[in-house]
Swiss-Prot record:
Pathway recorded for this protein: Amino-acid biosynthesis; L-histidine biosynthesis; L-histidine from 5-phospho-alpha-D-ribose 1-diphosphate: step 5/9
The species this protein was found in: Corynebacterium efficiens (strain DSM 44549 / YS-314 / AJ 12310 / JCM 11189 / NBRC 100395)
SUPFAM superfamilies named among the record's database cross-references: Ribulose-phoshate binding barrel (SSF51366)
Protein name stated in the entry: Imidazole glycerol phosphate synthase subunit HisF
Designated gene of the protein: hisF
E.C. numbers: 4.3.2.10
Amino acid sequence: MGVAIRVIPCLDVDNGRVVKGVNFENLRDAGDPVELAKRYGEEGADELTFLDVSASKDGRGTMLDVVRRTAEQIFIPLTVGGGVRSVEDVDQLLRAGADKVSVNTSAIARPELLSELSQRFGAQCIVLSVDARRVPAGEAPQPSGFEVTTHGGTRSAGLDAVEWAITGEKLGVGEILLNSMDGDGTKNGFDLELLEKVRAAVSIPVIASGGAGTAEHFPPAVRAGANAVLAATIFHFGEVTITEVKDAIEKAGFEVRR
């Protein structure tokens, strides 16, 4: 058997509160990331990802507190991303209890940040988050047909998405979180072409994100080369459970952790 495919819920956190509404029964406080993290741990999540969407400085301090409290309650790896700009940011998050930190926009502005981080903390702690989309008509083409975006998928970074993933691996990151901005929130399934292209180009693990709508959407992503699958809305609203996703992946002939 190969390595088990990981199933990862993602929570958007703003000033210490979960942003996208959550529809779990009998949760005391559906907006508390720590409560939700616990629930997901109990439901069989292999890892958790927090995305800090707070713009304010206060939000950063609150996030460290959330990470601390979560790390005390759950026993699965926790990745934290959003607004990570420096060695100090990563140091604080890891000290607070994060296992991995994901870096996005700041690495586009200064790619050497990735090598500084992986040398200081180890590749296993550093995830490169890539917000990719198909190059729209009328824009400068990219070799792979996919480009890197910033500002929530609204602006082109002028980089080829596959090339950027290769650069990330060369600079020492341990994992690629590949977000399809075209798929994000559509529930039409993962962008398999994007996944296949990145998978063929790098040897580090790739996490597929963006587009999951049903449990049946997950096995094709794994077939396309995803080592892990990430989703937000469908888990939070109880549309699909982690168990259902694992059942579907296992039924397709892949190993999952139970």
